[in-house]
Curated annotation (Swiss-Prot):
A molecular function GO annotation: sigma factor activity
Protein name according to UniProt: ECF RNA polymerase sigma factor BldN
Further facts: A mutation in the promoter region (called R112) carries a GGAG to GGAA change in the putative ribosome binding site that reduces complementarity to the 3' end of the 16S rRNA; this is presumably very poorly translated. R112 colonies are white and produce long, straight, undifferentiated hyphae, with rare spore chains observed, sometimes showing highly irregular septum placement. Additional pleiotropic effects are seen such as substantially reduced aerial mycelium. The R650 mutation (Gly-103 to Asp) probably interacts less efficiently with core RNA polymerase.
Positions of region (Sigma-70 factor domain-2): 105-172
Gene: bldN
Tagged with keyword Transcription: yes
Annotated family: Belongs to the sigma-70 factor family. ECF subfamily.
Keywords, alphabetical: Sigma factor, Sporulation, Transcription, Transcription regulation
Post-translational modification: Two forms of protein exist; a 35 kDa form in early growth and a 28 kDa form seen in later stages (at protein level). In liquid culture the larger form accumulates to higher level than on solid media. The shorter form results from processing just upstream of Met-87; the exact position is unknown. There are 4 possible start codons; mutation of the first prevents protein production while mutation of the other 3 (Val-44, Met-87 and Met-88) permits production of both forms.
The keyword Nuclease is assigned to this record: no
Protein species of origin: Streptomyces coelicolor (strain ATCC BAA-471 / A3(2) / M145)
């Protein structure tokens, strides 16, 4: 019913490169320049740990200041690219009761939701059940979804996240990522040696991710493996964007300490 879950090679490659940069920094001078961003004085250094944080705090302030005037004028849906506009059209049709439109939304987002749940629970059967329940709840609640800059996929992941939390509360099941099943490389042909080395490197990285605390683990999963933006991750996790950047920063630093040098 659901596709085989493979590693998002680009996401893992980016995470591995970010962790490698953090390891290099940890081997040299570090402490003061890399204080916790929320507490750092003056400008936050745009170091590698912020590679996926969508710009430094300065950039964020510039964007906010430039958009502050426009934000006060209207509350209409912002101009979006063609894909976003198409998705929102499907959402609106589904809200009007079109079953075909909801079916197309399912086709578009089921893989994303399934991957998120699978990375969290580590079992195919459980992931399939929770994915089905996610879309059942989404169908019941689709009338409550409003755009306001929020991606529909992030809304679905929020529902999935709550179901995963309920799953862990209602059982003794522990998060256990089945690394062997996730290491499915089927994009391009590589030499056997390269494939083995990449698999070993991915396995070590995923093992290190499993050893993060739950919030750091979820942040890394959403940001690197699911490819969500800082804003989307913040909405899914119920935090502000600054908290997500700090969480990501600490997670990457922890991974840099956990990951063996030969697994980079």
């Amino acid at each position: 019913m659901y596709p085989h879950v493979g590693v998002d090679a680009s996401g893992l490659a980016t995470l591995r490169a970010t962790v490698k940069s953090a390891q290099d920094l940890l081997r040299g001078f570090v402490p003061t320049a890399y204080a916790v961003p929320a507490l750092a004085a003056a400008a936050v250094p745009a170091g590698p740990c912020y590679a996926l944080a969508e710009g430094s705090a300065v950039v964020g302030r510039r964007a906010r200041s430039s958009s502050s005037g426009a934000a006060a004028t209207t509350h209409r849906r912002p101009a979006a690219d063609s894909d976003s506009a198409r998705m929102m059209e499907l959402v609106e049709r589904a809200q009007a009761g079109e079953a075909d439109a909801f079916g197309r939304l399912y086709d578009q987002y089921s893989d994303t939701v399934y991957r998120y749940i699978y990375y969290r629970v580590g079992g195919k059967a459980t992931a399939e059940d929770l994915t089905s329940e996610t879309f059942l709840r989404a169908l019941r609640r689709i009338g409550t979804f409003t755009y306001q800059g929020r991606d529909f996929g992030a809304w679905l992941v929020t529902i999935a996240r709550n179901l995963v939390a309920d799953h862990f509360k209602s059982s003794r099941f522990r998060l256990e990522v089945t690394t062997g099943e996730m290491l499915d490389a089927n994009e391009v042909e590589r030499s056997p040696e390269d494939s083995v080395l990449e698999s070993l490197s991915n396995a070590a990285l995923l093992d290190a991710v499993r050893r993060l605390n739950p919030q750091q683990q979820e942040c890394v999963t959403l940001r690197f493996l699911q490819g969500l933006s800082v804003a989307e991750t913040a909405r899914v996790m119920g935090k502000n964007e600054g908290a997500i950047k700090t969480l990501q920063y600490r997670a990457v630093r922890t991974l840099a300490r956990l990951l063996p040098d030969d697994a980079r």
